[in-house]
């Protein structure tokens, strides 16, 4: 199957849409005189024209004004600052609160309770600040059996070497090191 390029696809789409819409424009009364002769125009005007028994009438300004008033629906804009009663006392997003509505005494009590329950971030992550020194009781206790980073790295390397040479064979790297050492020794 052949793949159609984008330009050809667009050209095909435009041609198809213009062909399909040309049929609808041709049946319109305004386009007929351009495509047909004046002889056939009478036939179309009789079919689509105004019946001979009715007269055209113009709409007066008063009728137009009355018609417009009946069909227009007036909508008031929604109030922007209206808050539902149930959500009036809730804090705003991201922990901000409206301070104007609270008394100073209530604000002090709330701040004291928050400080005791939630330490500041430097305290939580083991860093000390100048204003709040830590006591040894506040410091996280390190388990006695945990290894230091250098000891842990040494254990991992030893296990890796045991996996690489399980039968006591030396690894390639060890053999190269010994060869280099033998070459460096002076011959006697």
Swiss-Prot record:
Modified positions (Phenylalanine amide) in chain numbering: 94, 125
InterPro entries: FMRFamide-related/fGRP
Signal peptide bounds: 1-26
A single Gene Ontology CC term: extracellular space
Cellular localisation: Secreted
Record flagged with keyword Secreted: yes
Keywords tagged on the record: Amidation, Cleavage on pair of basic residues, Neuropeptide, Secreted, Signal
Keyword Secreted: yes
Propeptide: 27-57, 97-106, 128-188
GO annotation (BP), single: neuropeptide signaling pathway
UniProt GO MF annotations: neuropeptide activity
Chain residue ranges for the region called Disordered: 116-144, 163-188
Family: Belongs to the FARP (FMRFamide related peptide) family.
Protein name as annotated: Pro-FMRFamide-related neuropeptide VF
Source organism of the structure: Mus musculus
Encoding gene per record: Npvf
């Amino acid at each position: 199957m052949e793949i159609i390029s984008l330009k050809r696809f667009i050209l095909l789409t435009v041609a198809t849409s213009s062909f399909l819409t040309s049929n609808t424009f041709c049946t319109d009364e305004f386009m007929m005189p351009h495509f047909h002769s004046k002889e056939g125009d009478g036939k179309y005007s009789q079919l689509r024209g105004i019946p001979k028994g009715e007269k055209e009438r113009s709409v007066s300004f008063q009728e137009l004004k009355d018609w417009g008033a009946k069909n227009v629906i007036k909508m008031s804009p929604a109030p922007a600052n209206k808050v539902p009663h149930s959500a009036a006392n809730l804090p705003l997003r991201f922990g901000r609160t409206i301070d104007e509505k609270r008394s100073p005494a209530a604000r002090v009590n709330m701040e004291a309770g928050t400080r005791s329950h939630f330490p500041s971030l430097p305290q939580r992550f083991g860093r000390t600040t100048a204003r709040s020194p830590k006591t040894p009781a506040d410091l996280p206790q390190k388990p006695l059996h945990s290894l230091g980073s250098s000891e842990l790295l040494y254990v991992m390397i030893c296990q890796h070497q045991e996996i690489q040479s399980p039968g006591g064979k030396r690894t390639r790297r060890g053999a190269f090191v010994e060869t280099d050492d033998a070459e460096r020794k002076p011959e006697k």
